[in-house]
Amino acid sequence: TRTIIQSQTLNGQRPAIRQNPSRRQDQWVIGLDIGYSSVKGMSQNTLFTFPKFAKKLPKNAVALAKPLDTDILYRDENGEIYAVGEKAEKMLSIETASDNDPTLFGRNHYYSETFKIAARVGLAMALQSNTYGSPEGKRIVVQTGLPSAYMLDDARYIKEVFADHYSFDLKMGREDWRHYEFALTENDIFVM
C-alpha cells in the first residue's frame, strides 16, 4: 500500500473533492476504514490512504532525518513521536513484526496502540481545511465499517475506541507540526 497525501495534478496537494452535493452544512462527515493493512479515508474535501503501521521513534530521530513528502509523524500528549504509514512500514524488520502479529491482524486489534494512532492520523487528515471546505464550527461525524461477520459483536468496541477527547500533533511531509484538539461521542460515530 502506498501513501496518498499528494497529487501532481493539484499543485502538489492531496486530492481534493470540489463538491459533494449530499453534505449537510452543519456537519463535517468523515468516512474512515481502518483495515488490517491500510487506512482509507475521505471527508467532504479530500481523500487519502496510508499503510496501517506505527512505530515509536527515539527522542532525537526527528531532528536527524530529512522528511520525505510521504512521511507522517504523530506526537501524543506525552510528547512521544511515532512514524506512521510508509515510514513506519519501512522501519519494520523480521524481528519486530510478522504476518500474524495480533496488534496488526488480530481479531480484537481495536484497542492496540497501532489502531488508535492510525485512527487519529486518519481523523486528522480528514479534518484539514482546503479551498473546497473546512470543518471549522461543524459537528464531526465519522462513518466507519466492519466486516459483516463482526458487525453485531464489534460495533460497540469500535465506537468505544473512536469516542474520545483528542489532543495530539501531526506532521505530514515537510509541513510544520499541526495541533488537533476535538471530541467525539458515540453519537458521532456510525458503523456499517
Go through the PLM ranges and name each one.
Residues T1-M192:
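Nucleotide/phosphate-binding catalytic cleft detector across ATP-hydrolyzing
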